[in-house]
Structures are given as C-alpha cells and as structure tokens.
C-alpha cells in the first residue's frame, strides 16, 4: 500500500505557492509577464515542454475554448467565465532555437480565435521544473491561479471531463 502511494503523481506540493515569474510572448511578439499581467482574475495555464506533451496540451484547446473563452449567446449570455487562459509551449535548451518557427507554424495552423491564448516561452526550464514539480517530460501541466497569482489547483496530462470539472469547481 505504501509503495502504491509513492507511485501516484501528486501536484499537491505546488498548491498554495505563488506561480513563478515567467516572461512569454504571443504569436505577435507581445510580451506577457506571468503572473503579474494576469492579476485581478482567475487564470488557467497549460504548460508543455516536449513535442509529445504539446500534443496532449492540444487536447485541452477545444474544451477550454468552449468553456472559458467563447462568449455565450442567447439565454446563457452573461453566464460565461471571466478568466485568463493561456496555453504555453516551452522552448528550452536546444529547442529554444525553434521558437520562431513554432510561432509561424501556429499562426498558419491554429484557429485564429485561439491564437491570442497561446504564449511562447523561450528560456530556462530548471526554475519551472523545480517550482512547479514537473515530474514527466511527456505530459502537459495545468495550473489554476487565484487573482493574486497563487496556485489553487494543479493537474497534468491529457484532457478529461473529470479534470475539467475540478478546474471549473476551483474557478467558480
């Protein structure tokens, strides 16, 4: 039983900590400083630092867009969420040189409605790997920040309804 508990990945160590300072850029090269520039609202961040984890990060795009970004119409107008959402592919080490190419590819291939919600990080991985408890390279990590930048919830991996329900519960 004890061994089983050790094998279960836990994001609990980061909950309650401030999200570490990160400077990233939009596809149009606008600098966004996290958590500084998102203070005042709840924020959902998705980070990926390998090609494989980027694919799982992408599995969140549509559900997150539908739930938190797309403006509700008709009877439900006014019942949407007022949250910041950013998906952040991280280009570190030798991959940092690919940032420009990735931006161009995103502009060409990503739904234009989603582009403002993608930030590109280029720089060191170690400070984030340590502060955010990244255990596995091939999965994305998600964090819900409170309006001051403190981590309220953390999860990882491909999209699932149960993960989305937990994200939603924290934001409500």
List the predicted regions and their residue ranges.
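Thiol-/selenol-based redox modules, centered on thioredoxin-like
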Residues: 127-130, 137-172
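Structural microenvironment flanking redox-active thiols in thiol-disulfide oxidoreductases
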Residues: 53-111
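Solvent-exposed loop/turn segments at secondary-structure junctions
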Residues: 51-53, 91-95, 125-126, 151, ...
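Short active-site neighborhood of thiol/selenol oxidoreductases, capturing the structured segment around
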Residues: 37-61
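Thioredoxin-like thiol-disulfide oxidoreductase module
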Residues: 94-138
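Sec/Tat signal peptide C-region and signal peptidase I cleavage site
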Residues: 8-12
């Amino acid at each position: 039983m004890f061994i089983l508990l050790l094998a279960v990945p836990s994001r609990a160590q980061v909950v309650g900590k401030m999200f570490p300072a990160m400077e990233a850029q939009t596809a149009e090269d606008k600098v966004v400083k996290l958590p500084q520039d998102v203070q005042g609202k709840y924020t959902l961040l998705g980070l990926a630092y390998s090609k494989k984890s980027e694919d799982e990060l992408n599995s969140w795009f549509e559900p997150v867009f539908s739930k938190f970004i797309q403006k509700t119409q008709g009877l439900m107008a006014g019942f949407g969420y007022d949250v910041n959402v950013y998906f952040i592919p991280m280009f570190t080490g030798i991959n940092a040189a690919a940032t420009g190419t990735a931006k161009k590819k995103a502009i060409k291939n990503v739904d234009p409605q989603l582009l403002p919600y993608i930030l590109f990080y280029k720089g060191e991985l170690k400070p984030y790997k340590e502060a955010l408890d990244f255990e596995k390279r091939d999965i994305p990590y998600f964090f819900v920040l409170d309006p001051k930048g403190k981590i309220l919830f953390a999860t990882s991996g491909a999209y699932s309804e149960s993960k989305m329900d937990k994200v939603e519960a924290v934001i409500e």
